[in-house]
Amino acid sequence: MSKCGRKKYMKTNLRQMTMETIDSQQDGSLPDSVAESESAHMQTQTGQNSIPTLAQVSVAGSSTGRGSPAVTLVQLPSGQTVHVQGVIQTPQPSVIQSPQIQTVQVATIAETDESAESEGVIDSHKRREILSRRPSYRKILNELSSDVPGVPKIEEEKSEEEGTPPNIAAMAVPTSIYQTSTGQYIAIAQGGTIQISNPGSDGVQGLQALTMTNSGAPPPGATIVQYAAQSADGTQQFFVPGSQVVVQDEETELAPSHMAAATGDMPTYQIRAPTTALPQGVVMAASPGSLHSPQQLAEEATRKRELRLMKNREAAKECRRRKKEYVKCLESRVAVLEVQNKKLIEELETLKDICSPKTD
């Protein structure tokens, strides 16, 4: 075998030996010591600069610890022992320690549809409770009128669950029923019929119909209502929906007097002395809103038109007067300027006469 072939063979065997040693240490099968047979071909340096023989010897490989470089003990044929260190070294553990990073996880809890629905239901219940606690206008009116004498109280309208009052029968009657201070019930139907019932009567069955008649000399648009029942003292107070009404009969006269807390559509009526004589049991109710007949409406429109025209005429007259005053002022100013102009012309002629002889 030539020298080149020997060198290549030795290098190849040395690489294989070193790789096997490193693999055995990395696997960790022998943590304390590793004993194995390895074949090593060493080249001894002599004065002739050549490799005399190729020896195969048994060596003992030891490792000081895991991760340290592998050191192989090689015994030559001449009896000399050589320590051979592996070329490939395992990576050393880093001395620098990485800082410990504390990981914090933030979890967001989203509201589900059920929670949103439950909140909506709670809000609706609260709103209903607030609305149910609000007193009705009738309750407020009764509280305000409790200290005022002669003002009747209106019964609260009970809900459907509580049922109808015991003294009013449950029947479909398209009327508005009111209770007076004397206990009587006044029902006003849609057609304009007014009915009165006594306190002892059972519901609306005891209502008395009031006949609608016309008087000989009532005011235009007035309504004549006949009733049959009055209180013991001759006074009666009741509420009637609508505008202000004047009521008269043979003995008494009813005039509207609004309370401070009244809503405007529920005027109170008080009794006064009569001014005219009407048939017995007949009252005259005249509403100012019903007095506007077509003729009166036309007269009102004509009156407004005449008033507007009169204001326009007065404004035009004032405008003409101011224009005349302005023209007179301008005329007087022109007259003054003309007089001044004449004086200046005369002075100019005089100056010319004075200057002309000197030039000659």
From Swiss-Prot:
KID domain segment(s): 104-163
Biased composition range(s): Polar residues: 19-28, 40-52
Cysteines engaged in disulfide bonds, as pairs: none
Start and end residues of each stretch annotated as Leucine-zipper: 330-351
Phosphoserine modification, residue list: 118, 145, 287, 290, 293
Region (Basic motif): 303-328
Keyword Phosphoprotein: yes
Domain of life according to the entry: Eukaryota
Gene Ontology MF terms in the entry: DNA-binding transcription factor activity, RNA polymerase II-specific; RNA polymerase II cis-regulatory region sequence-specific DNA binding
PTMs per UniProt: Stimulated by phosphorylation. Phosphorylated on Ser-118 by TSSK4 in vitro.
Alphabetically ordered keywords of this record: Activator, DNA-binding, Nucleus, Phosphoprotein, Repressor, Transcription, Transcription regulation
An example Gene Ontology biological process: regulation of transcription by RNA polymerase II
Signal peptide feature range: none
Subcellular locations according to the entry: Nucleus
Complex formation: Binds DNA as a dimer. Interacts with FHL5. Interacts with CDC34. May interact with TSSK4.
UniProt protein name: cAMP-responsive element modulator
Organism field: Bos taurus
